[in-house]
Amino acid sequence: MKKIILLIFLTLNLIALTTNPMIKIPQANSCNIEDNCIDFSRKYSDDEYKRLFGIYKSECEVKNLDACIYLAEFYKSGLGVKKDAKKSIEILNKACDESNKFACHNLGVEYQEMKDHKMALAAFKKGCDLAFIQSCFNVAVLYNNGGGVKRDYKKAAKIYKEVCEQNFYEGCYNLAVLYHNTPGVKRDYKEAIKLYKKACDSDFSISCYNLATLYQEQKEYEKANKLYFKACKLDFADACNNLASLYDDALGVEKDDEVAFRYYNKACRLDSASGCKHLAYFYYHGIGTKKDKKLAEKELKKACKLGLKEACEIVRDFH
């Protein structure tokens, strides 16, 4: 039974365009609307949303660009006002024209959500020209994926390198994957290792994971083990699964069923379908734990629910 999950390829698991709400609005310390800086992670009452909407609208009308960005988000999300995506984009366009990097970036995010890659690229380019690193990264991703522009790995790599040098670790990671295993790009394992390591050293878990898979491909199991351990500790599910498989198959370590069981269990708790399937196998046969067919069935059902067809087939024939 093959247990090792293969490298997470760029085409399947490229870090997505930056759409984190914490990036989509000004950070708290940049807000200049005294005592009225909303925390979008909190839920407010309808009356409070309406009150804040009125303040942001008035402030935006006198060109307080922070207020305009908040106002756009209120229109987009329907907070204190009827949803109006068109109005949100209009407000962001005006603020972006006033050289507000947050507005340009948020505008790009909104266009990207609408699948208008060409307009998203233009907005992100403006944000990048205003030295907003997340926008630069998104420009690189669009060149990488051919979004709104002809695919151009060379341009993507150039921008990834620039943002990586500014310690934006998503850029280091994506550039590493380009060098590691991307069709149409010359492989450079030495450079990929260096870039993965830089991001991993700053606890960028997926980078630790991919570096581990690279070492595993080269049968350097001891190095792979350490990196899977680190990524698993950072709650990267597939790393826990692969770490378990090293102990299960005695690759670079002594075979240890109890340790394998423990890491398959953690992988499953972190929603790794493969982890759940292997956990079920251990429960069913009593490997590294007490035999328990009910728990085996439960974990198989979870693996099936997480999309593993093989687990669904086993569940059907379980009894």
Describe the residue ranges of each PLM region.
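N-terminal leader/linker segments that initiate helical-solenoid repeat arrays
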Residues: L17-I55, E59-V62
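Hydrophobic face of amphipathic alpha-helices that form TPR/SEL1-like repeat modules
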Residues: C37-Y44, I55, Y70-S77, C104-E113, ...
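Classical Sec-dependent N-terminal signal peptides that target proteins to the secretory pathway
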Residues: M1-P21
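Short helix-capping/linker turns of helical repeat alpha-solenoids
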Residues: I33, S41-Y44, E61-N64, S77-L79, ...
